[in-house]
Each structure stands twice: as C-alpha cells, then as structure tokens.
C-alpha cells in the first residue's frame, strides 16, 4: 500500500492557492493574463452605469454592483452599505464563477473608484487576499490604449468558493473608541474636508471623530484616473500625521470612500482596518466624541 508522509498528505489535501497577485495591476499585465485559466474580471458600477457595461467592457468581464450585491439591503433607519453575512457573499461570488483557485481583477468605468475599492475590501474580507487586484486607470485607460473591448456578456459557470472571513479587517465603534488615544493606531477620515471641518453634514452631527486625521479620498487618484505614486501617497499620509508602523483605521460617511484610503494604506504597507459603520454609525451615538464643528 502506497503511503505519503504527513506533510505531503496535508499539502495534497489543502485547498489550491493561486500565486499572490499584486493589488494594483497595469493594463499591460491584464492584457498578458486576460486568458489565464481561473481569471475572473469584474467591471464595477451600479444601475446608472449598467448601460455602459452593456455597450462596452473588457472582453470576458462581468458586471458587479457592490452597492447592491455586496451590501445589506437598504432599510429605513438602518446603516447603509454594511457587509452582509458570509453566506450571502459566498452565494454571490459562486454565482459569478468565483472558486478557490480564482484570481480576480476589478476595474472601474466612468471613474467609479470608491465602489471598486469597496469591492476589493469585501473580497479581501472574504479571504481572497493576495488574489484580488485593481486595474490602474480602469476602462478609460484600457480604451485609451486601443485595447479590445466587447459588448458580449460572458457565459458563466458557477464556482465553488470556500470563504475564510477576515474579521480583523473590520473595525466597529467599540474598537475606534478604545483606540482614540492609542499612539499605535491612527483614525483617518476619508471624507471631503468640508465634512471633516464641519461645514457640511450628512449624519446630523458636524465635524469628525475626535482626533481623526484627514486624508480625503479624492487625493488618492490623479486626474487621469490612476493611483498616485507610492511616494506621493506616503507624503500625503505623513502630512496628515500618520506614521509608519501605525495601524490605520479609515472611515467616511457609509464605508465606501474610506475603502479607497484603506486600499492606499494597504499599498503602502500599513496594517489597515475599515470602520464599516463609519460616521453614519458614530454620529448617531450621542456619547461618542465629535470635534471640528463650525458655528
């Protein structure tokens, strides 16, 4: 009877892991890998941009709307854009052909940067870390280079995916409150400065979480729709008082804009978490401190 050493047996039984992919890829990289077995490509949008996908997308790409497919249902009085249950996300991913050996590339159309980074965060949360990438420049960069596009939706075979949720990527109000004075943790507000400074509000309280730094989400991507260089991003983080080695916890209004700053933090090598409830959650808790209000 043939026997295998325990180490080889465990390796044989372990789920297949695709080689790690860079979190940010170029159009050249995607063109070179577009026909790889196991590659799943998503054009990110919503109901307003579905028509764009129907008329033009990267060949083989599927349409993904994170605001509806990767979120809890919208209910009056409930928090918006919260992560749904793992089983719900697993069902969505499998229906789109995602399996344990898949490698995923996300790209924006019409500069939908924050929904794209939110989708990236969700996939990382589900345990796909190291196998998910964002296409730098999105559909616009792909088309500008004269690369092929299609209007044909791909035929998708359901996948089999085993989720490994990473709860450590998600922060809640309790975590944020407990680390407001922690020098090893930096809370970062990703909203426009008008909200950070308290001139505008969406959630009934003006200002920002006490002690939070400001890195507006608009500063992460340049006017051409590509991510700023690591040196530029690091300089912006440093200017906001964020130090190397700190854990970065990002928030915004509902957890979407914050995902773009979270992604940038990950690119720079920071340990990063996203406060999923964000200011919509913090502001409704009267006992939690807010500062920066303007008269």
Segments the model singles out, each with a brief description of its role:
Residues 19-26, 32, 72, 139-210, ...:
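Active-site neighborhoods of enzymes that stabilize oxyanions during catalysis
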Residues 73-102, 217-248:
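Helix-loop module immediately N-terminal to the HCX5R catalytic loop
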Residues 233-235, 240-295:
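C-terminal soluble interaction/assembly domains
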């Amino acid at each position: 009877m043939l026997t295998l050493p325990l180490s080889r047996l465990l390796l044989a039984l372990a789920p297949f892991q695709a080689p790690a992919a860079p979190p940010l890829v170029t159009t050249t990289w995607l063109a070179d890998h577009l026909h790889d077995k196991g590659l799943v490509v998503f054009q990110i949008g919503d109901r307003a941009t579905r028509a764009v996908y129907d008329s033009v997308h990267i060949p083989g790409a599927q349409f993904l709307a994170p605001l509806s497919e990767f979120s809890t249902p919208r209910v009056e009085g409930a928090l918006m854009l919260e992560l749904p249950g793992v089983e719900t996300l697993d069902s969505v991913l499998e229906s789109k052909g995602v399996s344990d050996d898949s490698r995923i590339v996300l790209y924006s159309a019409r500069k939908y940067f924050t929904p794209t980074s939110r989708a990236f965060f969700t996939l990382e949360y589900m345990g796909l870390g190291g196998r998910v990438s964002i296409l730098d420049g999105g559909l616009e960069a792909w088309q500008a280079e004269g690369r092929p596009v299609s209007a044909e939706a791909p035929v998708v075979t359901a996948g089999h995916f085993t989720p490994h949720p990473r709860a450590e990527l998600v922060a809640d109000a309790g975590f944020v409150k407990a680390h407001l004075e922690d020098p090893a943790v930096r809370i970062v507000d990703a909203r426009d400065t008008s909200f950070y400074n308290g001139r505008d509000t969406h959630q009934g309280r003006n200002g920002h979480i006490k002690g939070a730094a400001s890195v507006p989400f608009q500063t992460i991507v340049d006017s051409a729709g590509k991510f700023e260089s690591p040196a530029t991003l690091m300089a912006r983080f440093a200017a906001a008082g964020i130090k190397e080695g700190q854990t970065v916890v990002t928030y915004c209004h509902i957890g979407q804009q914050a995902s773009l700053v979270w992604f940038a933090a990950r690119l720079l090598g920071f340990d990063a978490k996203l406060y999923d409830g964000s200011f919509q959650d913090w502001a409704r808790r009267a006992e939690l401190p807010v500062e920066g209000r303007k008269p």
